Amino acid sequence: MTLQEFQNDIRAGIPDRLPAAKPYDRQINHAPKRKEILTPEEQVLAIKNALRYFPAKHHALLAKEFAEELRKYGRIYMYRLRPDYEMYARPIDQYPCKCRQAAAIMLMIQNNLDKAVAQHPHELITYGGNGAVFQNWAQYRLTMKYLSEMTDSQTLAMYSGHPLGLFPSHPDAPRVVVTNCMVIPNYSKPDDWERMNALGVSQYGQMTAGSYMYIGPQGIVHGTTITVMNAARKRFTADRRDARGMLFVSSGLGGMSGAQPRAGTISGVVSVIAEINPKAAQKRYEQGWVDELHHSLDELIPRIRRACREREAVSMAYVGNVVDLWERLAAEEIPVDLGSDQTSLHNPWAGGYYPVDVSYEASNKMMAEEPARFRECVQESLRRQVDAINKLTARGMYFFDYGNAFLLEASRAGAAVMGEGGRFRYPSYVQDIMGPMFFDYGFGPFRWVCTSGKPEDLELTDRLAAEVLEEIRRTAPAEIAGQLDDNIHWIREAGRNRLVVGSQARILYADSEGRTKIAQAFNRAIADGRLTAPVVLGRDHHDVSGTDSPYRETSNIYDGSNLTADMAVQNVIGDSFRGATWVSIHNGGGVGWGEVINGGFGMVIDGSEASDRRIREMLLWDVNNGIARRSWARNEGAVSAIRREMERTPGLQVTLPNAADEEMIRNVLKENE
């Protein structure tokens, strides 16, 4: 397809003349059939809803086709409308547009659907089993058409993948405002999502899937590296001061979990990651994100022993069920140093977790046709997995929950994961590592994408970012010196670690000062021509301010506000009028539907003074909103960080907490009994 044909296809939107039906491509990793949940009347409504995108002349043909999709897959994806052109992040100049910001958003959307990047590209799922960009291909086509027509004085409203339309606004307003799976709180249970998604009225956007900010497994690998490195440091003794030879065991080689083996190798440990889906394991192996594939535990166990003995930095994928792996490690008394889990347990009944003793294929069939039996198998599997993990922790393994709802779903299954006082016996990684060491000080997963598509532009941004962090490090207080040192090492090594999958993007944990100064350095480089095209700034929603999640991002908030969502909602509103190019707010993401509220942003910078102003105003709020909230929760690191920010930033005044003597309070209560 020529560039002109590609651009014409984008501008056409939903074509008046329907394209030919497309065969089901079995070479692509597809989503499993979804649960059959709709009543006969609701099935009528689902098809009626889908036909809204098409003129009546096509309804008879498409109604039959959509009914078949609903029967076979549990959803209406409109495969017929999947474009013929290759899906990937093109250089920004190749997108037809009236507004440069809109072209950047088109680039980001296509990256999320690139088959090298997305988990189930033909079902518009980027990662996590159900993290959707759109619900169907009509929504994709119509959205791209709107973006190609958008001016600097319009804003596109996106309702769970549905483009509501272009509305008049102004150049400083966001070009796109995204909401995903925002529902009335009483209707936020898993079956509510299944029903609403099957009806075509809501979608689970995960975090960066539905907000057009996913950058492949690199997007989580820096945070995973930080986590593994600091978990390993918890195992250090006077005689053991490095991670070499340590064994790290976990599961998952999907869009997010696929970062684990690379993070383990960067950290210097032996990583063994189980993955039940052969296509997912093969994909990560071909991309170089995992070093070895093993299909037999009889072969894997001796290989693990040798790698640990020889202190290799190596990653291995076990293509099989993680419970079999844990039980074998426990039975063989293999000394595991670090353990975690990244199965998609936010989505346990629809492909996020595969039970032991049931094949991958049989599980996919059972979850759709016998959901009650499948649930029983999953819960029994979780109980067995926890039993094996408990045996290994009794021998010294440090196990942490990776914020995927593992402990939550294991507890619901009756597994032995509860400790004293009704608390989980194992910490989340945010409680032990990410929260007190990073989020409380404002460090989080800042990221950027070079819209030129040129590797040399990305190399320059790496150098600029490293220079900024090194300058900050010279006068940094001791309490954040270690974080800065790790992040400087990361960005200096990023190119050599071959992290790019999809767009020319980079992830870097940075605080408010670092993010702002790095972005300003990029903006100057665009202005003087050293960078050849605009840069998109963004972050994961898994950040200082972006997510309220009591089992993950806000699990180290202990003042009782961990169940509130004011921070995430305030954050997206504040970003929207301080300069974000697009903003998003989601229900779910990470731990699951009904358990989280999270949001994010994208900002296109183009070398202008307007971009510099937006950088200063928006990035300050985007980080310090969360620090202020964490400070009010009496987190010591956050109190220190917000005091420094108030000294640095004129006009910033934050309410600080006063410490109360808990023993005094207890005595008062006793006196009043």
Placement of each model-derived feature along the sequence:
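Long, compositionally biased, glycine/small-hydrophobic-enriched stretches that function as flexible linkers
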Residues: 1-198, 202-217, 371-521, 525-538, ...
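Active-site/ligand-binding-proximal alpha/beta "capping" segment
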Residues: 315-343, 350
